[in-house]
Amino acid sequence: MHLYLCVLVCLSIGMANCLLPGGIRRMTDEEIQNDEILLTGVEFAVDKYNSDTNSRLIATNVISATVQVVAGFKYNALIELRPRLCVQDPKTKIATCPLRMNLPTKCSFTFLYQSWVPQKYSMLSTKCLRA
């Protein structure tokens, strides 16, 4: 009954962005740019992908994202990644290397954020395609 009333209230006041538990909601461009949990999660996902694939990619654009309330927040983000022009050297900081602009990769990262656990972010899935 409570869920029915919540849905009815959301529909009656025209709230397209009403986030119900379990409901998947597409994030606006403004939300994507300002959501610290999402942006930190994207960094986490890219770092994990780089570690797993021995790559040196950096996120250059969050194309789209969705969020779902579960036991935490489940995010799915479509990210454009570009390689850095650096030799694989642990002494070289990736942020100082120039971007290689002609080889974008698009990845869909799904990760979970749970503020109450020690490891706040966990990867659920990764799918990447070189453009």
Swiss-Prot record:
Record localization: Secreted; Nematocyst
Disulfide bond annotation, renumbered to this chain: 86-97, 107-128
Motif mapping: Secondary area of contact: 68-72
Keywords: Disulfide bond, Nematocyst, Protease inhibitor, Secreted, Signal, Thiol protease inhibitor
Signal peptide: 1-18
Molecular functions (GO terms): cysteine-type endopeptidase inhibitor activity
Site, Reactive site: residue positions: 22
PANTHER family from the UniProt entry: CYSTATIN
Task of the protein: This recombinant protein inhibits the C1 cysteine protease papain (Ki is below 0.5 nM).
Note: Activity of this protein is stable at pH 4-11 at 4 degrees Celsius, but unstable at neutral pH at >50 degrees Celsius.
Recorded family membership: Belongs to the cystatin family.
Name this protein carries in UniProt: Cystatin J
